[in-house]
């Protein structure tokens, strides 16, 4: 079937030349015809495209190149054909550049395409086809994706359904990781043209994979294969999906798909790389290398090349060809994108193999940046940084390993690595990490704990001071090492040696020096080159004070290693300890001359200390002193430059500043060092020295004392001397003396201490002797101490150490002591005389005190006798008054008896509530009263005497009432439930003597206001004084109380308000005695009625009872007691009667008696 033809018009004629597409002539022939006939440009382009379709690309290029020059442009719209010609040729060059593997040729083709597109821009810039071609060219260049996006966008704005523009936008979105956007563009293109090629389905499948929609991706790849069975991309996509299922059948299907793709396109780099990966896991490394190399050479895409190099590198890695592996890993990292970090992981391993930890760390850091929580990477980085000297990196390692142990708590290696990092900074957590590793080994792995871990745990306990635990672990490590020696004798014997050395150090800490010495020597017998054993033996000898033996051991170490810095340092320290500054200085300078130890910090500090020490020696050469200061300062600065955190160098700088006189600056330096660490004793001492210089003696003393407590288990004579100096300066000589004596007990032969003790004794003695108030004992003690100081100074002036103090000063002080001793007799005599005077004065004072004491005793005795006499007189007066009162009561009772019998009514009595009558209750006759009172007198003071003794005076009565206040019941209480047991016991006796009631005559009704009852009480608290019993406080408002009580009382319905003021008599001790007092009260009532009957009788009664002032007052109080009885109280011992009320009631009673007459 003919594919068609094209007609070429002949010039200046109407004839044409027809060229059949199936029989196209050579390109050059066609070009000559077209040139000869001056053919229009669009015919050139059509012929060129036909040549391209037939695969004749050379003729296609020749035609288009010739058309650019010779094409006829004399027709309408020739600009569009001219642009099409340029764009078509440029698109061909772009396609060729995409396929070209040679970089130079590719660059040349891209340059030609760029030139052609630029020329086309000048003709028609915004043509859609032109813009599409140029956008595709930008995509090929890779770094012009934004320009391509803008051009595709411009086309879509003009033609929203333009399929090339949609596919271009989809490609750009996919590369920008906007997979949803890319999928949307692919879908729109597919809807616009459902007959799109398989590549559109392939792009959709890749989008579905990125969106994790694997089922849809599988369908898309399958549909692409349906449309194009030879679509390699779809086959590879399906193969990868199958391989990722990680099942045997799926893997088999995936490999078959890859094989099919390889059959279709054996040079496809993607297929080759996937097959290489498959054969790597099949351990067919030769095929891996063949396929990966083939893939590498068949692609110019760097991502593909990186994959190929990685496959090659790991195949060589697993075959332990580390040089080839390193080469390909490195090449892969050059091609790889930022997200492809597997080559960096392998390259890091190669660097570790080569010992280049720095580059290895950089590689793994790149991996960790892409995958922040990758377990293997964090573990490797932690291990690398753990061995670093940089503390920051060690902190990073600690952080990584902590994350590893959190993600995988059973990783023993990670726990051990973490413990090793923590050993230097956090011993407790290091022990915890080792404990976790040990537990995992024993419980999870079911394995024995390695001797290395046991040794490390023991060393940590040793550092913490847990010597018992450390010993246990060291012994366990030795046992494990012996057991494991069967498998690797050489290795585990070396472990045993290290553990034995540690055990010997432990015995040193336990002060078992014999055991440690034995272990060190055993190690040296087996390993004579173990230098540390020589050094420890020398250190033990040095601590015992055997400097020569120590020096021999250190020299033995130098026989093994002539340049061993520790041995030279220890020898230098021996010289410094003996104050041999020159030889010591040479030893440290020798260390610094060695290339390997030219910056040795310890040696530089020791040299600085030597120069600093020379400043303490007395010298008059100021220039020399300044040179020494500058040298020391320069050395300390050099140490700080090498190690900015060296606190000892900073402390040295502070000391030099203090020597130069910059005391404030020195104190600031020392304070900063002390803030950084409180574990350096020198800093504390230097601060205390500064305080002394600033005359802050109290602060200095506190600092010295704190330093002694914190750093020195035993008394340190040097620090004690500093403390004594501070106390001496602040004038505390006694405390200074005690401190110096402590130091003397430690170092009795120290001449400096002896000099200072003598000086303090001399000053103390001088103060005591000059003080005129000093007693004889103090003066004698001062003379004794002065003599001791004199002997000390004399001794020191002859045999003292010239290097430590001036002997002439001791001679001068001895002479001063001698002068003071020559004056001592005067001070002793003065003190003795003063002491004798004081003794005489004390004797005289004692005698005066004794006389005064005897006088006071005599006065007290006389006063006591007078009180006894007065008491006897009072008792006699009381007895007389009681007797008179009884006689009076008996007489008046006999006089009143006939009249009462006439007035007495019936046996019944009217209720108090009616308020019509008051009842008078009579008790026994006079004959029955006397025996009852006699019985009471036998038991003590009679109740009658107590009751009537209260009549001595109204003032006395009130005092007694205030002192004997009782808890009160509410006014108007109806019950007497709180009667004491005594009153209940006496009630039957009262019933045997029936009360004789007597009605008040009607003419007396409402006129008799109150009656008093004179009672006697057995209360001993009134000291046998007489008292008026006021019944106003014990009144009950209800007449029903009468039957329950055998007491005789006057019941009145008047003055109820006053009665309400009285309280309850419950619990009163007098209540139990009222039955005995009723007979006296009866006589008193009879007498009062008779007195109220006539004024003459009343006057006669008053005269008979008024034999004395006291008796007159008693009678008056008795009348007042009668008025108190009107309140209805049945407690005759109550003490609440008021004087004013009593006077008013007396007047009322008298008026009532007048009316009754």
From Swiss-Prot:
It is found in: Nucleus speckle. The keyword Repeat applies. It comes from Xenopus laevis (African clawed frog). Component of the PAF1 complex, which at least consists of cdc73, paf1, leo1, ctr9 and rtf1. The PAF1 complex interacts with PHF5A. CDD domains: UDM1_RNF168_RNF169-like. Its main location: nucleus. Residues 917-928 have a biased composition (Acidic residues). Residues 889-1157 are annotated as: Disordered. It comes from the Eukaryota. TPR repeats lie at residues 41-75, 129-162, 163-196, 198-231, 235-268, 306-339, 341-374, 412-444, 451-484, 497-530, 531-564, 566-598, 613-646, 648-680, 681-714, 717-750. This is RNA polymerase-associated protein CTR9 homolog. The gene is ctr9. It holds the Pfam family TPR_19. Disulfide bonds: none annotated. GO terms for cellular component: Cdc73/Paf1 complex; euchromatin; nuclear speck.
């Amino acid at each position: 079937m003919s594919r068609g033809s094209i007609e070429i018009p002949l010039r200046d004629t109407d004839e044409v030349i027809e060229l059949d597409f199936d029989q196209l002539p050579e390109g050059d022939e066609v070009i000559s015809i077209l040139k000869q006939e001056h053919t229009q440009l669009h015919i050139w382009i059509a012929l060129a495209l036909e040549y391209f379709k037939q695969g004749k690309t050379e003729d296609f290029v020749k035609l288009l190149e010739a058309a650019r020059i010779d094409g006829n442009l004399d027709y309408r719209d020739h600009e569009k054909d001219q642009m099409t010609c340029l764009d078509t040729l440029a698109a061909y060059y772009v396609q060729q550049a995409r396929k070209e593997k040679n970089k130079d040729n590719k660059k040349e083709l891209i340059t030609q395409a760029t030139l052609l597109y630029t020329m086309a821009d000048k003709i028609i810039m915004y043509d859609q086809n032109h813009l599409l071609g140029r956008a595709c060219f930008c995509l090929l260049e890779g770094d012009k994706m934004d320009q391509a996006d803008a051009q595709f966008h411009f086309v879509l704005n003009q033609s929203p359904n333009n399929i090339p523009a949609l596919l271009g936008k989809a490609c750009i979105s996919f590369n920008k990781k906007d997979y949803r956007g890319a999928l949307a563009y692919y879908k729109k293109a597919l809807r616009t043209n459902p007959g799109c090629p398989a590549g559109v389905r392939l792009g959709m499948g890749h989008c579905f994979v990125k969106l994790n929609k694997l089922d849809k991706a599988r369908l898309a790849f399958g549909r692409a294969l349906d449309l194009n069975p030879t679509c390699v991309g779809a086959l590879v996509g399906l193969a990868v999906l199958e391989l990722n299922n990680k099942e045997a059948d799926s893997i088999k299907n995936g490999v078959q798909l890859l094989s099919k793709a390889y059959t279709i396109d054996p040079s496809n780099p993607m297929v080759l790389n996937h097959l290489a990966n498959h054969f790597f896991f099949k351990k067919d490394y030769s095929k891996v290398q063949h396929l990966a190399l083939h893939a590498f050479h068949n692609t110019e895409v760097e991502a593909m090349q990186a994959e190929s190099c990685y496959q090659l590198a790991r195949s060589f890695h697993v075959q332990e060809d580390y040089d080839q592996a390193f080469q390909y890993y490195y090449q892969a990292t050059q091609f790889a994108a930022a997200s492809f970090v597997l080559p960096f992981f392998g390259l890091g391993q190669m660097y570790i193999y080569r010992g280049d930890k720095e580059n290895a760390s950089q590689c793994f850091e790149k991996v960790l940046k892409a995958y922040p929580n990758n377990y293997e990477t964090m573990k490797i980085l932690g291990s690398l940084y753990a061995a670093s000297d940089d503390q920051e990196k060690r902190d990073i390692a600690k952080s990584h390993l902590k994350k590893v142990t959190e993600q995988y708590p059973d990783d023993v290696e990670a726990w051990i690595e973490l413990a090793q990092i923590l050993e230097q900074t956090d011993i407790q957590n290091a022990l915890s990490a080792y404990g976790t590793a040990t537990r995992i080994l024993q419980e999870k792995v079911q394995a024995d704990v390695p001797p290395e871990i046991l040794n490390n745990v023991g060393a940590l306990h040793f550092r913490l001071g847990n010597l018992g635990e450390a010993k246990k672990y060291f012994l366990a490590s030795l046992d494990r090492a012996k057991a494991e020696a069967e498998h690797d004798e050489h290795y585990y014997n070396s472990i045993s040696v290290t553990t034995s050395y540690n055990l010997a150090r432990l015995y040193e800490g336990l002060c078992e020096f014999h055991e440690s010495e034995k272990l060190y020597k055993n190690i040296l017998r087996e390993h004579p080159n173990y230098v540390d054993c020589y050094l420890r033996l020398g250190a033990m000898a040095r601590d015992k004070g055997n400097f020569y033996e120590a020096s021999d051991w250190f020299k033995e170490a130098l026989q093994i290693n002539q340049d061993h810095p520790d041995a030279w340092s220890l020898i230098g320290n021996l010289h410094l300890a003996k104050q041999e500054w020159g030889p010591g200085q040479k030893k440290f300078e020798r260390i610094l001359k060695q290339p390997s130890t030219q910056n040795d910090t310890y040696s530089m500090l020791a040299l600085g200390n030597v120069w600093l020490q020379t400043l303490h020696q007395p010298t008059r050469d100021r220039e020399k002193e300044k040179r020494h200061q500058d040298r020391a300062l320069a050395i300390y600065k050099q140490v700080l430059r090498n190690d900015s955190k060296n606190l000892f160098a900073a402390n040295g700088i502070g000391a030099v500043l203090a020597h130069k006189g910059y005391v404030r600056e020195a104190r600031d330096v020392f304070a900063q060092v002390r803030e950084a660490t409180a574990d350096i004793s020198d800093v504390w001492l230097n601060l205390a020295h500064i305080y002394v210089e600033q005359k802050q003696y109290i602060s200095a003393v506190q600092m010295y004392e704190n330093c002694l407590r914190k750093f020195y288990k035993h008394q340190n004579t040097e620090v004690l001397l500093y403390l004594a100096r501070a106390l001496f300066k602040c004038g505390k000589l006694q405390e200074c003396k005690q401190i110096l004596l402590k130091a003397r007990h430690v170092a009795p032969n120290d001449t400096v201490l002896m000099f200072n003790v003598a000086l303090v004794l001399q000053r103390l003695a001088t103060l005591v002797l000059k003080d005129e108030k000093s007693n004889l004992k103090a003066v004698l003690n001062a003379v004794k101490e002065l003599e001791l100081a004199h002997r000390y100074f004399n001794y020191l002036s002859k045999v003292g150490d010239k290097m430590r103090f001036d002997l002439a000063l001791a001679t001068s002080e001895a002479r001063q002591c001698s002068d003071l001793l020559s004056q001592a007799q005067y001070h002793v005599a003065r003190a003795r005389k003063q002491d004798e005077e004081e003794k005489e004065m004390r004797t005289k004072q004692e005698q005066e005190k004794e006389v005064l004491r005897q006088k006071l005793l005599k006065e007290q005795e006389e006063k006591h006798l007078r009180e006894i006499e007065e008491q006897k007189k009072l008792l006699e007066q009381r007895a007389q008054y009681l007797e008179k009162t009884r006689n009076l009561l008996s007489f008046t009772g006999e006089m009143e008896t006939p009249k009462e019998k006439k007035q007495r009514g019936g046996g019944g009595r009217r209720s108090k509530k009616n308020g019509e009558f008051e009842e008078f209750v009579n008790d026994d006759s006079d004959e029955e009263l006397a025996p009852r009172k006699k019985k009471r007198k036998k038991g003590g003071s009679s109740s009658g005497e107590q009751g009537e003794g209260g009549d001595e005076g109204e003032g006395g009565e009130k005092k007694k009432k205030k002192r004997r206040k009782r808890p009160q019941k509410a006014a108007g209480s109806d019950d007497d439930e709180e009667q004491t047991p005594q009153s209940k016991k006496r009630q039957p006796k009262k019933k045997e003597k029936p009360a004789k009631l007597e009605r008040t005559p009607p003419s007396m009704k409402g006129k008799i206001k109150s009656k008093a009852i004179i009672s006697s009480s057995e209360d001993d608290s009134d000291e046998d004084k007489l008292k008026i019993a006021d019944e106003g406080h014990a009144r009950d408002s209800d007449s029903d109380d009468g039957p329950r009580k055998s007491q005789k009382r006057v019941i009145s319905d008047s003055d109820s308000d006053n009665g309400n003021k009285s309280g309850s008599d419950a619990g009163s001790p007098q209540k139990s005695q009222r039955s005995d007092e009723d007979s006296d009260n009866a006589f008193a009532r009879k007498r009062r009625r008779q007195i109220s009957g006539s004024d003459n009788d009343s006057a006669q009664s008053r005269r008979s009872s008024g034999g004395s002032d006291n008796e007159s007052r008693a009678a008056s109080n008795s009348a007042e007691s009668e008025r108190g009885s009107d309140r209805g109280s049945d407690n005759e011992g109550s003490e609440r009667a008021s004087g004013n009320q009593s006077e008013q009631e007396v007047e009322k009673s008298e008026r009532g008696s007048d009316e009754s007459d």
